[in-house]
Amino acid sequence: MGRSNEQDLLSTEIVNRGIEPSGPNAGSPTFSVRVRRRLPDFLQSVNLKYVKLGYHYLINHAVYLATIPVLVLVFSAEVGSLSREEIWKKLWDYDLATVIGFFGVFVLTACVYFMSRPRSVYLIDFACYKPSDEHKVTKEEFIELARKSGKFDEETLGFKKRILQASGIGDETYVPRSISSSENITTMKEGREEASTVIFGALDELFEKTRVKPKDVGVLVVNCSIFNPTPSLSAMVINHYKMRGNILSYNLGGMGCSAGIIAIDLARDMLQSNPNSYAVVVSTEMVGYNWYVGSDKSMVIPNCFFRMGCSAVMLSNRRRDFRHAKYRLEHIVRTHKAADDRSFRSVYQEEDEQGFKGLKISRDLMEVGGEALKTNITTLGPLVLPFSEQLLFFAALLRRTFSPAAKTSTTTSFSTSATAKTNGIKSSSSDLSKPYIPDYKLAFEHFCFHAASKVVLEELQKNLGLSEENMEASRMTLHRFGNTSSSGIWYELAYMEAKESVRRGDRVWQIAFGSGFKCNSVVWKAMRKVKKPTRNNPWVDCINRYPVPL
């Protein structure tokens, strides 16, 4: 059983090493077998520089909160032992200039603090577009639409069918019907038509829910990775809703499925420098424009997973919105691994040998994704984990650092653990080399993981030690809507709201990853109990059927 579990995480690759130059096998071709993990145990190795980075963020935010209690304690200790008469006597002993100067410095310091501290950013509400039923397809209908287009041979269609059966995607996802066309659908006209449908659908719902007029929006950020026309999608939104001329608009492209959190981060920065403003963030992807019509299996995979979807989020930094906001933005941590060549090319848009454009998925994707995820959660940990978990983590880290047994076991970690598991023996040296895995359930009540695929979600659950309930929103979103790219984490939050599981004070962790390779996290805190929606929620008509087994 132990060996089976170990092998499940491994993949093999035959590497051609060329012609043997010397020895008994001179002149013969040689090969080697490289063994890789599907998704590395990213919590089994910790880079201290990312732990340090997390504490750097924490100190930057908490320096004032740590200083003020100390000053209050010192002042209380000095004044607490004096009677009222003694206090007045001491004040009378000082001249007027000293007293005025002291209070002047105090007031100035308080003003500088309140003026320089980051403004709170609130999430007023959000909307997720639900396409019409004419776009709904089952897995069998999806294959038939692809066959009807006449662009795929039976071998490619069979490969698509096998991928879909193991994907975790259900029979009610949405695709543009144009994928069945024998003509070229990756045109600007087709892309604009799909973009206007999903973006305006989400924004109409958002403006209805928040009762904010489009002209009152001061910041607009639109992210779409593949489809980037001129004029931009943000300009298309401004034109459609006749927004004001001095709006700060941004259009993010080519940043993959994690771009939604990047857009939130950009909107937050804009709100810090523009008081009393609303910001709208739109996240989407165009399925038809990204449709690949070749036979390269590594480029066919995105066709099987990506589905129609769009989210629109209303943010505000106005203090009066504190009362009716749903969530407050707590933390954003971004990780970018593009400096590494393997990470940079793990998801890569290019043409195949026949000249057909598409996204190529590298065999290294799971490995580089795990590394990016490890870096991100290591940086996020000090900001969100309770002090008890941080103490246990550092105790385990010190034990691994200074224990000779841990150092020895590190060099032979794979062989030792494999042998121990095979023989059913618990290895003490392996225990020393294994770091303490923090319990993230103590830091968050709700988890929204990017629903990339069933396998990815299973690996995340295992490595983070999460329960089925923690993963429910991500799995059900994958089943009902498929991979909607950067908007997927909002469909997951909408699922939680439809289940009435979000209560005042709850912390929500959204995490997404995409090309580059990037992994980004955002943490929200619920400002109030979110009531079950009766309309304007993509889950309203089907929430009673969920969860379902995958």
Swiss-Prot record:
Leading EC class: transferase
Gene Ontology biological process terms from the UniProt entry: fatty acid biosynthetic process; response to cold; response to light stimulus
GO terms assigned for molecular function: fatty acid elongase activity
Name assigned to this protein: 3-ketoacyl-CoA synthase 10
The family this protein is said to belong to: Belongs to the thiolase-like superfamily. Chalcone/stilbene synthases family.
Membrane topology term: Multi-pass membrane protein
Gene for this chain: FDH
Tissue specificity comment: Mostly expressed in epidermal cells of floral and vegetative meristems and, to a lower extent, of leaves and coleoptiles, especially in young tissues. Also present in trichomes and phloem. Expressed in siliques, seedlings, flowers and leaves.
Annotated phenotype, changing residue 497 to K: In fdh-7; constitutive postgenital fusion between floral organs and some leaves, which result in malformations
InterPro entries recorded: 3-ktacl-CoA_syn (IPR012392), ACP_syn_III_C (IPR013747), FAE1_typ3_polyketide_synth (IPR013601), Thiolase-like (IPR016039)
Source species: Arabidopsis thaliana (Mouse-ear cress)
Localization (cell): Endoplasmic reticulum membrane
Keyword RNA-binding tagged: no
